Structures are given as C-alpha cells and as structure tokens.
Amino acid sequence: MSGPIPARVDSAAKTVLLGLIDDAVKAGWSLGRICGLLELDRARAWRWRHRQAAGTLEDAAPGGHPIHGLLDWEEAEILSLFEEWGPVDLSHRKLAHRGSYTGRVWVGPSTVDRILARAGLRLPGRPRPPRGQKKPWPDWVQWKKNQLWCWDASHFSRCVSAPIVYGIVDVVTRKWVATILCSEQTSSQVKVLFLAALEAEGLLEALEWRLDQPDQVDLDDEAAPVLLAVSDNGPEMRSGETRAFMALLTIGQHFGRPYTPQDQAWIETLWGHVKAENPHLLTITDPEILAKELERVRHTYNTVRLHEAIGYVTPDDEHEGRGDAIRLARRVGLAAADQARRAAHRPTP
C-alpha cells in the first residue's frame, strides 16, 4: 500500500493495516507515531480494532433503507396491477392512479415506472398516430401576395367575455391582414373574419355578387380560386357551413396534418411574437380595450416591426412591393460604406 488511506477500504486492507500497527507497537512505536506515519486517524484505528474483535470489520453495503421506502406488499401489488391492468391503462401514470382507484396501493407514477423497470417489465404505451405526408400547394397557387393566407385562433384568457382572437397572415409577405375578437369559435366568426380581410385587401368588391346572388353561383366552376386559406383541422375550419362559405367566395382550403402545428407555422409564429413582445395583452380584461390594443399592435407589426423572414423589411413594405428596393438599397449602401472606409484608411503616398 502507498499514499493516503482512502475514505473506504475493504476488510483485507484494514487487516493489513492493523497488522502493521501491531508489529510497530511491539517494536516500541507509539500508536500515535505509527498512525501519523500511515496517515491514519487514531480514532479510525481504534474503531477498526473494536470492529475486528466483534467480527464486523467488513463495511455494510452502501445506502440504507429510507423510512419512506416501499413495503414488500406494495411492490407485489404494483406487479399485480401490471399483469391485470397494464394492457388496459397502457401507461405508468394511469396504472398508479388505478392502484388508488381500486383501493389496492397508493404510489406515485414514477414509483410504478421504477418498480416495473427493476422487474424488466415495460408497458406498451399508446403509439403516436403516424405523421402523414405533407400535401403540396395546388398547382394554381402563385407565390405572391393575397394568394396564400394562413389563419387560426389564439386565446387571451384574462378577457373572459371575449377571450378568442382570430387572425389571418399572408404567407408570402407576412402581413397581418385582419383580426377579430370574439366569444366563441364557430363558422359565423370565420365568415366575419374573411369578409373583413377581403374588404381590407380590395378583393371583396369583385366577389360581392356571389354573396348577393348565391343561387346564381356555379359551385362546380373549375376556375382557379381567388386564394388558398391554410389552417389546422379545428371544428370551425372543417364545418360544412365554413366549406360552403369558402366555396361561395372561391376560396380554396388547405388543411395541415393532425398534430403538426408546423404546417401552420406562419400564424403560430405571428401569435408567438405578438404575445411575447406585448405581454400586457395577456392581462387585459375589457374586450373593448383588448380589441383596440390588438389593432394598434397589428398596425405596428405591419408598418414598423422589421421582419427577419422577409429580409428585415416591414410586412407592409413587402406587401406593397417596396421590399426588393429596400433590400437592394441596403446591399448597395453596405458596398458603398465599405469602399468609403477603405478609402479613408488607405495610406496616402
């Protein structure tokens, strides 16, 4: 052995050390001197000596038995629950509650999971629905403004009387086209939202005759729709009334895949930015104030806030066709500034 004595040593090492101490004491060394040479605390040596006499020199296994540890019968009940209810409950969380529901054992979900893992058992779980293939845009869609609108609702729960806000964002230009505050999510709100958006973009006038004379509209007309509305699979999006309204106004519908919010990323991103950058909206309780604030935020979002996804111009710039010129002016300005700095720092002969 060499070096300091570790904090834990086995019984064989202790026996060797105690033998060295005995030999040194017989040779006339004091206990303190030999312990100092061995870098061993004297109290530790005395404790080993007493344990050697009692036959307990070997350390007990590390750890202990916590006073809140499971009892044997509880572990047995967990395993029994697995056999009886595992195929029904499918998860350790439900199985833990099944134990108390049946009055057999009261344990937490993590305890059930740990006991089953220790026994090499595994619950089948509920398989995730397979993610479908993303549908491509229809062939008639063009990558320009007012061709792709993405829409969805968000919730502002502090405004109890009208907590739901619908919004539409233009996928190409990222303009926040329209928004309405309402108390419920039905096809009626969808109609109001889209009529407001169409009017704001100057598209409603050409479609008004369809609303005035719906009986004269040929719903089987194969002419390209005026635009494509992208949404998730909410009830008001899929309802027959909404479908009929969209068909009347020649608005195509495109639904994202279930459990895949990325398919509606444009509107999800809009609401995320709105709430993160304007947290006061989440504290407003008066619907009239909330509606005014949302309209103010919408105006700022469209005309002031620079949007990264469209090259750091405002959505209004992109929507009105100024985006390319602004981005070009920046590139030209950067190049000119670089040349000016080089000229200023270039040493003169």
Task: Name the predicted role of every residue range.
Residues 1-44, 49-61, 77:
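Residue-centric detector for conserved, function-critical "anchor" positions
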Residues 3-4, 11, 225, 247-251, ...:
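C-terminal domain-tail junction helix/linker
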Residues 7-8, 46-148, 211-217, 260, ...:
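Basic, flexible linker segments flanking DNA-binding modules
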Residues 24-28, 85-88, 201:
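Short coil/turn helix-boundary motifs
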Residues 28-31, 92-99, 104, 109, ...:
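Hydrophobic/basic alpha-helical segments enriched in Actinobacteria
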Residues 106-108, 121-122, 136-167, 171-300:
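RNase H-like DDE/DDD metal-dependent nuclease/strand-transfer catalytic core used by mobile genetic elements
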